[in-house]
């Protein structure tokens, strides 16, 4: 009787125990990451040949205490290695774990290798060769605290390497994990199975091998036991011959049929080739198709199971498309697969919620380093009787109401960029902005008291509802996650797509970039202020400080300004401002662009202007600025400098985004200036729900000074 250990992915231990017991294993004991079991030689080889769930089968050789590297060396050397494999064979050591003395797995592996080589040298005066690639013998050493376990790896390469999958797509599932997903899905032998996002076909091939009674190890060419001195070649030949007979018979007798599709034709060709190598090609029909074209392959029956590992994104810009994909999949399942079962495996439970289906069972498992979930659904035989899940219903109703009102208003105003929703409901803390045919959803960073997964789920619900309410293709929605504006946050680069969109604002054409920066290049809340500046600037010299992308300069120029001067510290935004001016025919020396620290430039210029627009950051400590700037603290210093540049009958429009900003009216008066708040006049219909989005003032010379 052999004492053996089968390793597996975390979360699959119970399944593996049941599988080993079905093969005839005794005394099965679950530990984290595997199962200890007992069995004779036949069972040992059967477990290697037939286990669909094990990662490796190990034959323990020795356990011993390790308090030093010498203990490790002596414990390994105590094993009679020449009795295990011949000196003419190659070997490799896999070492995992550390303790206070063995702090590096590479060092541990080196000590083990030395002990094995020295064991041969002492007994035979010869040494075996170490081979990193496809060694004849693999020695596995696991160190935990002060205990080392040495085992012979009978598998060789991991058992998930069945031998049929030479080619894979971008994100392949390991075969043993795929087998576990199938076993947990509720799929029954003899019934059909479909995978609408099958990639290189692993789930379908594994299920077809189960249905046709094909041993998962039947196609493997290399094993870790064939160079073992105790290898029973005759018994192994008997077991593989028996497995071949069962596979041929199973292929003829199975009534299961399998259907796979994927949008990538190249991957579908890989899947077909993999199925041929696995010996199950005749059971699987593959098609290159988008999920949107998914149809029930057996509309007249019988019913079966849809099993898939749909894509999930780690990049923010992929999430709208994935949310739309899952939402569409849910609709197709309800409409066309009545009576079927559905089982999806994903690293994103939030995406699975976008199916708008209620799961009846849920399992957890690891896919490499990723925590994953598998959810099983029973699809109603009558689609009208399906139990759906309402997603963000309050948000959807509010957005629908806002859209009905604001779309009509925007058309009357002659604008195509406006805010549809701005954290109207506390549970859905996002802003939704329309830019022509596109929509930007910005999530404000949730408070630390809100559970991160709950916040992410709400965001996914918002995107799902937004796509539905606006009837929007997913590639027309841009998602951003941001904190409320602070200092120079708008200058942070998020991506490098370089995709610009030309939009209309009254009579101006303006370039926006919806993906690359935290902001888009157009502050929507200042729309009326820009319109006012255009009317104020006819025949005037106009100065735009902290100009960003120069949109105010465009309106001033179109309003008939004699000259525009646009000052900003960022070369990127000045180039953008130039692009905006050019789009409106505002070129020539009268339209200047100056790259400078605005505060320093103010202190060093004596130029005079009739209209000055300044929208400074609330706070700034840019590397290019020698001192910090706080708009509440420093606005009088700013006004003193601006007064020098302002002609007698000139006007300063001063705006900022600081909540609770208090203009020092006494200080303004002492400077010989007058300030009038015009915040209410600059707030448009789409920002009526957020009166604190900005504050705005007109500042002029006092009557005494004039």
Swiss-Prot record:
Give GO MF terms, alphabetically: 23S rRNA (guanine(2445)-N(2))-methyltransferase activity; RNA binding; rRNA (guanine-N7-)-methyltransferase activity
Sequence similarity: Belongs to the methyltransferase superfamily. RlmKL family.
HAMAP family from the UniProt entry: 23SrRNA_methyltr_KL
Instruction: Report the gene name.
Output: rlmL
Pfam families referenced in this protein's UniProt entry, alphabetically: Methyltrans_SAM, RlmL_1st, THUMP, UPF0020
InterPro entries tied to this protein: 23SrRNA_methyltr_KL, DNA_methylase_N6_adenine_CS, RlmKL-like_Mtase, RlmKL-like_Mtase_CS, RlmL_1st, SAM-dep_methyl-trfase, SAM-dependent_MTases_sf, THUMP_dom
Task: Give EC number(s), comma-separated.
Answer: 2.1.1.173, 2.1.1.264
> Which function does this protein serve?
Specifically methylates the guanine in position 2445 (m2G2445) and the guanine in position 2069 (m7G2069) of 23S rRNA.
Q: Which residues form the THUMP domain?
A: 43-154
At the highest ranks, the source species' classification is: Bacteria, Pseudomonadati, Pseudomonadota, Gammaproteobacteria, Enterobacterales
Q: Does this entry carry the keyword 4Fe-4S?
A: no
GO annotation, cellular component aspect: cytoplasm
Q: Which reaction does it catalyse?
A: guanosine(2445) in 23S rRNA + S-adenosyl-L-methionine = N(2)-methylguanosine(2445) in 23S rRNA + S-adenosyl-L-homocysteine + H(+); guanosine(2069) in 23S rRNA + S-adenosyl-L-methionine = N(2)-methylguanosine(2069) in 23S rRNA + S-adenosyl-L-homocysteine + H(+)
What is the protein's given name?
Ribosomal RNA large subunit methyltransferase K/L
Q: Where are the transmembrane segments?
A: none
- Keyword terms of this UniProt record: Cytoplasm, Methyltransferase, RNA-binding, rRNA processing, S-adenosyl-L-methionine, Transferase
Q: Which organism is it from?
A: Yersinia enterocolitica serotype O:8 / biotype 1B (strain NCTC 13174 / 8081)
Compartments reported by the entry: Cytoplasm
């Amino acid at each position: 009787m052999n004492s053996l250990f089968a390793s597996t992915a975390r979360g699959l231990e119970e399944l593996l125990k049941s599988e080993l017991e079905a093969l005839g294993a005794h005394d099965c004991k679950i530990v984290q990451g595997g199962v200890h079991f007992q069995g004779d030689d036949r069972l040992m080889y059967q477990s290697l040949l037939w286990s669909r769930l094990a990662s490796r089968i190990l034959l323990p050789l020795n356990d011993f205490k390790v308090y030093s590297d010498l203990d490790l060396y002596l414990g390994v050397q105590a094993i009679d290695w020449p009795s295990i494999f011949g000196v003419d064979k190659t070997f490799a050591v896999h070492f995992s774990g550390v303790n206070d003395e063995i702090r590096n797995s590479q060092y541990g592996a080196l000590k083990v290798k030395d002990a094995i080589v020295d064991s041969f040298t002492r007994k035979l005066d010869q040494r075996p060769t170490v081979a990193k690639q496809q060694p004849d013998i693999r020695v596995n050493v696991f160190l935990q605290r002060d205990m080392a376990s040495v085992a012979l790896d009978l598998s060789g390469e991991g058992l998930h390497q069945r031998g049929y999958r030479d080619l894979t797509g971008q994100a392949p599932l390991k075969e043993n994990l795929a087998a576990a997903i199938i076993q947990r899905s509720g799929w029954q032998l003899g019934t059909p199975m479909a995978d609408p996002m099958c990639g290189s076909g692993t789930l379908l091939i594994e299920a077809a091998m189960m249905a046709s009674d094909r041993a998962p190890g039947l196609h493997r060419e290399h094993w870790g036991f064939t160079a073992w001195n105790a290898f029973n070649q005759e018994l192994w030949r008997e077991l593989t011959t028996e497995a071949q007979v069962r596979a041929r018979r199973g292929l003829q007798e199975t009534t299961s049929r399998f259907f796979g599709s994927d949008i990538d034709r190249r991957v579908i060709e890989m899947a077909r080739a993999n199925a041929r190598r696995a010996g199950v090609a005749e059971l699987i029909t593959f098609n290159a198709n988008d999920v949107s074209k998914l149809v029930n392959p057996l509309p007249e029956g019988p019913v079966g199971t849809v099993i898939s590992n749909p894509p999930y994104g780690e990049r923010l810009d992929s999430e709208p498309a994935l949310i739309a994909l899952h939402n569409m999949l849910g609709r197709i399942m309800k409409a066309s697969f009545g009576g079927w079962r559905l089982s999806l495996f994903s690293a994103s439970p939030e995406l699975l919620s976008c199916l708008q289906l209620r799961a009846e069972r849920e399992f957890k498992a690891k896919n490499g380093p990723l925590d994953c979930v598998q959810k099983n659904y029973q699809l109603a035989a009558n689609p009208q009787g399906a139990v759906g899940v309402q997603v963000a219903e309050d948000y959807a109703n509010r957005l629908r109401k806002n859209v009905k009102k604001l779309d009509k208003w925007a058309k009357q105003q002659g604008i195509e960029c406006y805010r549809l929703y701005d954290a109207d409901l506390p549970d859905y803390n996002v802003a939704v902005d329309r830019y022509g045919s596109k929509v930007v959803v910005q999530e404000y960073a949730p408070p630390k008291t809100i559970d991160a997964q709950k916040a992410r789920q709400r965001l996914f619900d918002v995107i799902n509802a937004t796509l539905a309410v606006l009837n929007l293709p997913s590639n027309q929605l841009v998602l951003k996650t941001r904190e409320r504006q602070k200092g120079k946050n708008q200058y942070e680069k998020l991506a490098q797509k370089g995709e610009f969109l030309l939009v209309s604002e009254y009579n101006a054409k303006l370039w926006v970039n919806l993906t690359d920066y935290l902001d888009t290049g157009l502050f929507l809340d200042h729309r009326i202020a820009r319109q006012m500046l255009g009317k104020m600037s006819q025949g005037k010299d106009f100065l735009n400080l902290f100009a960003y992308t120069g949109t105010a300069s465009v309106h001033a120029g179109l309003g008939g300004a004699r000259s525009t001067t646009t000052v900003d510290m960022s070369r990127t935004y000045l180039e953008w401002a130039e692009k905006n001016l050019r789009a409106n025919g505002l070129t020539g020396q009268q339209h200047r662009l100056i790259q400078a620290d605005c505060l320093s430039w103010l202190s060093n210029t004596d130029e005079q202007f009739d209209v000055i627009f300044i929208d400074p950051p609330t706070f700034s400590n840019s590397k290019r600025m020698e001192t910090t700037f706080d708009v509440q603290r420093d606005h009088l210093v700013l006004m003193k400098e601006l007064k020098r540049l302002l002609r007698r009958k000139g006007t300063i429009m001063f705006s900022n985004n600081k909540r609770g900003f208090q203009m020092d009216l006494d200080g303004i008066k002492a400077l010989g200036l007058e300030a009038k708040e015009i915040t209410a006049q600059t707030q448009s219909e789409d920002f009526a729900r957020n009166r604190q989005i900005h504050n705005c003032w007109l500042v002029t010379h006092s009557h005494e000074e004039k």
